[in-house]
Amino acid sequence: MPAAISRNWPAPAKLNLFLHINGRRADGYHELQTLFQFIDCCDMLDFKVTETPELILHSNMSGVVADSDNLILRAAKSLQQTTGFNGGAEIWLDKRLPMGGGLGGGSSDAATTLVALNKLWHTQLSTEELAKIGLKLGADIPVFIHGFAAFAEGVGERLQAVNPGEPWYLVIAPDAHVSTADVFQDPLLPRDTPKLAIDTLMSQPWANDCQKLVVSKYPQVAKALGWLLEYAPSRMTGTGACVFGEFTQQQQALAALAKLPSEMQGFVAQGMNLSPLITRLSHP
């Protein structure tokens, strides 16, 4: 009897509510302090367990990423190799989040793949073990696996659960591809923000240390942020290009969205301190 398809596994976007760069390590990675929060805008994945070990990915974004580089397939293969599971999976991705942009979509897709297949394959790894697999694939993946809003330190792997407010956001995705590697290699990037205690960071105004550099190099980001600042406290997420404005009421965010210039793309979403992936995990 063929296996049923397990449907509607969410892979939410994240915002970096602040991002501070505290220095550069000997290995070239940067020491960070950042605050991750999920938003209720998600890619969706479906999974079917197969008896043969092949991993097959169907996507509405076919051709964008080579199979060998696709984080979803790499995550599934890593779980196979770690656990010795000898079956496979057929995976369907409904890509709804902007590619790149600092929303973490690729990392979130990989995290959802690890969490879902660990359940469907009955491989029974702990959350910590899944996060270790995820960290090898990308620094942002563990936060999506743990599934709670988090203060992160180090290269982003040391996580502490936090409960910031859950406001409404207007997110704008400028038509620009910002290379994370280029941002972190740029000599003009500030790398000397003092490390602060979490209580201090949570109570002071929030900022993104990458923002000034990216805005200076990408006029589309500068334009989107300039427009958004007319309506709400706003900043960039990650290394961009996406920017977000913070609103207390959904209606305020929707009213601003209605005025968005036609050449800009945006959407309204609510902050979430618990990932919808965790809610989905508790269902059959």
Curated annotation (Swiss-Prot):
The keyword Kinase applies. GO terms for biological process: isopentenyl diphosphate biosynthetic process, methylerythritol 4-phosphate pathway; terpenoid biosynthetic process. It is an enzyme of class 2 (transferase). Keywords: ATP-binding, Isoprene biosynthesis, Kinase, Nucleotide-binding, Transferase. It catalyses: 4-CDP-2-C-methyl-D-erythritol + ATP = 4-CDP-2-C-methyl-D-erythritol 2-phosphate + ADP + H(+). ATP binds at residues 98-108. InterPro entries: GHMP_kinase_C_dom, GHMP_kinase_C_sf, GHMP_kinase_N_dom, IspE, Ribosomal_Su5_D2-typ_SF, Ribsml_uS5_D2-typ_fold_subgr. It comes from the Bacteria. Pathway: Isoprenoid biosynthesis; isopentenyl diphosphate biosynthesis via DXP pathway; isopentenyl diphosphate from 1-deoxy-D-xylulose 5-phosphate: step 3/6. One of its GO terms (molecular function) is ATP binding. Its EC number is 2.7.1.148. The keyword ATP-binding applies. The active site is at 14, 140. Belongs to the GHMP kinase family. IspE subfamily. Catalyzes the phosphorylation of the position 2 hydroxy group of 4-diphosphocytidyl-2C-methyl-D-erythritol. This is 4-diphosphocytidyl-2-C-methyl-D-erythritol kinase. It comes from Shewanella baltica (strain OS185). The gene is ispE.
